[in-house]
Amino acid sequence: MVHVVVIGAYGSAGSAVADELAGEAGVELTLMDDGDPGGGLCILRGCMPSKEVLSAGAHRFQARHDDRLVGGLPEVDLERTVERKDDNTLGWAGHRREAVHDLAEREGVEFVHDTATFVDDHTVRAGGREFDADYVVVATGSSVDVPDLPGLGQVDYMTSADVLDAAELPDTGLVMGFGYAGMELVPYLSEAGGMDLTVVEHDDRPIGEADPAFGDAVLALYEEHFDVTIPTNCYEQHIEPTDDGGVRLHVEFDDGSTDAFEADQLFLFTGRRPGLEGLGLENTPVTPDAYTGESQDWVRDTMQARDDDRTFVVGDVNGKEPFLHVAKEQGFTAAENILRHDRGAALREYENVHHHVVFSGLGVYPFARVGHSEESAREAGYDVAVATRQASDDGVFKAKDVPEGLAKLVVDREDGTVLGWQGMHYHADVMAKTLQVVVELGLDVREIPDRAYHPTTPEILDGLVRECTEAVEK
């Protein structure tokens, strides 16, 4: 009998491991989680509740930009928005907990609702008991990454979780962090909260994974359509409280010049770090890499810890790619590899195609990337053919009153294989699924039908396909 302990069973990664191993012949499974209520970050404080509140802001944004509508502009009722968000997310979290508890009803499966700590290599303490395991799966998620900024301890700040619970907001704000959370919540604070915001951007533009035109499009969209100012190539130096209860952030630019911004409230959207605190890894051979904000290497692609073949680390906690679909797939890989390792078989390495979506522009103008960007394809040595189209090139986007944005398709000029796609426009989040199929199957652009129903937004894909096909056939 092989005993597997899963720490963090309520989350997406941990529950994926549990679901795969529960009922497996010869496996004893102990699931542990101290969540109250449990349900995982995505459901409780991440991707699901954020879409709840963004949708309220999106409706107002679209009404504000449609001059065919008359009468007063509706306001977003923040209290009602938060109440509905809470009702729905608690329901979704309840389904996750019930699924885990149902697994624990199976023979050979136990659930312990308590904090888990390593006692030694493969002994875990939880619920006043010690469990000796053959394999331990760590799926403890992530926590807010609070930057080491002088003066930060002297001022009040709000994180993304605080924003999702906010029934009232001040007039002005300073934002540190313009990654996924910042790009989603900044327009929400502006549109739904009526705030005037200054957002610090360290680079020339946001969305470092995208080709430059997409980050430039986001900058233009936010500064032209929301009450948002985004100083670029700008770095925080220190922060201090103001006499009236606000905050003053001192910054320095790449050219050496300095400035100071003041606002009523500071918002920290500065990312998340692996949730390792209190886990007791110091009692094991496992030594995580120092956190830098970059992808980490202390966990192999087999999902085994670099320092211990019998400890598997999945989801946000491994510091690789903090996305739900990746966490689940890593969980499936870990479960499979535990069984393979136990019987002495070769292990499978987890590989995934780049597939990211940012719900920028309140989700009205989301950014998505599947596979390569033009830049990454060229860096990988491909001779590429590239097509770029503005959303406004296709009449349907104008007809639907969503004319902003663009899309790009990248193919291998030699054999026509579609290498990647990027979109920052209406329905780009939906089209990402189509491109996932195309890219992961390695389809030849010349074999893709260029016929969407007219008039529908995927006509932008037809144009990209035609242009790349012509380039390959030259």
Located regions from the model:
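Active-site lid/adjacent beta-loop-alpha segment flanking the redox-cofactor pocket in flavoenzymes
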Residues: 213, 292-383
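Glycine-rich flavin
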Residues: 2, 9, 16, 20-147, ...
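Flexible, glycine-rich terminal cap/loop adjacent to redox cofactors
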Residues: 2-12, 16-37, 41, 46-48, ...
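A Rossmann-like FAD-binding core segment of flavoenzymes
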Residues: 110, 117-118, 123-124, 195-301
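Hydrophobic Val/Ile/Leu positions in short beta-strands of Rossmann-like dinucleotide-binding domains
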Residues: 6-7, 31, 174-175, 199, ...
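Short hydrophobic core segments
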Residues: 5-7, 116-117, 130-142, 175-176, ...
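FAD-site-proximal beta/loop scaffold in flavoenzymes
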Residues: 154-170, 262-337, 434
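Rossmann-like dinucleotide-binding cores of NAD(P)H-dependent redox enzymes
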Residues: 170-172, 180, 184-248, 327, ...
